[in-house]
Amino acid sequence: HDAYCGDEVAYGQIIGMPARFKAPTELIEKALSLNNLPDCKDLHVKAGLTVSGEWFVNSREKMQQIMDHFPEATAVDMESCSIAQVCHIYQTPFVSFRVISDVPLKDNKASQYYDFWERIANGSFEVTKHFINLIHNPSLIHNS
């Protein structure tokens, strides 16, 4: 979200790379099917655009800049795009799971952050475990 490589490419696009990296539909469907599993139903797995950059969103101005360029963004992080670029170069399917720790610019972000650490370990493990199982056993989608 914070890269500018001139007017020849889209805002945020690195020259020689796609403007956006799209996960394979099959992986997105498997990820969303996790919502139907009892161990994951409270985790609210969603699909959407994650924008990635080199600075932490800690002001209204930074958040507004992101929303001006990417109004459909559902998450902001500092890692996903670099991982997606490497996967693109090596032609490796990629999907990113983000556990949202806080909503930028909310008054209760400190409490959101501390509550996040209570939830992250079990939630991340369950999502990862079940997603890997779905990749190796596609029939599990229909049994949930």
Tell me what each language-model feature is.
Residues 1-70:
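Mid-sequence, gly/pro-rich, charge-dense loop/helix-turn segments that line enzyme active sites
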Residues 2-21, 90-96, 117, 135-144:
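Noncatalytic linker/hinge segments flanking ATPase motor cores
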Residues 22, 26, 61, 78-81, ...:
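Conserved active-site and cofactor/substrate-binding residues in soluble primary-metabolism enzymes
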Residues 34-44, 83-92, 130-134:
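A structural motif corresponding to the C-terminal end of an alpha-helix
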